[in-house]
Amino acid sequence: NVTREVIEDIAYICDGNLRKAIFTLEMLESRGLGADRSAVHKLVQATTLQAGRYLVELALRGRVVEWKWENKAGRRKRILVGALAEIDRLMNEHGLDADDVVQQLHGVLVGRRLSISDPLRDNLLEALAECDTSLKKSMHARVPLEKFLHRTAEAGELHGLAFS
């Protein structure tokens, strides 16, 4: 049973995004946490700045598109890892849309928990602004986001953070 307080928390967090609200509620209910307000807050924390910071750090190191092999049911399967995989995870597993991802990345870049120089921060904010503008014109959110990640990798290499 979902409590009124949990519904109110979800409504506040999702800020009118019905798809995100439904996804959040389904995720909580599937785990039997529909009555637990702290679970809503933990879910939000899990999908906030930590994941965004991690994917920016991966991109700065040039790790945008990487593959690794895993054994799944006795078969070797190639799995996408790296910054692009993190974007996919945020969008698919956590129900964030492209605007949510951009907001999260902006929070990471303007916050001071990511130790980068101001010129690099300016480069990344400019690339993110272009990404945000491109998202408004594109039907496929992954394309502008991937372009942002590649620009981030180029900036990381230019500033000595990535090794090609």
Regions found by a protein language model. Name each.
Residues N1-S164:
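AAA+ P-loop NTPase domains with strong preference for DNA replication initiators
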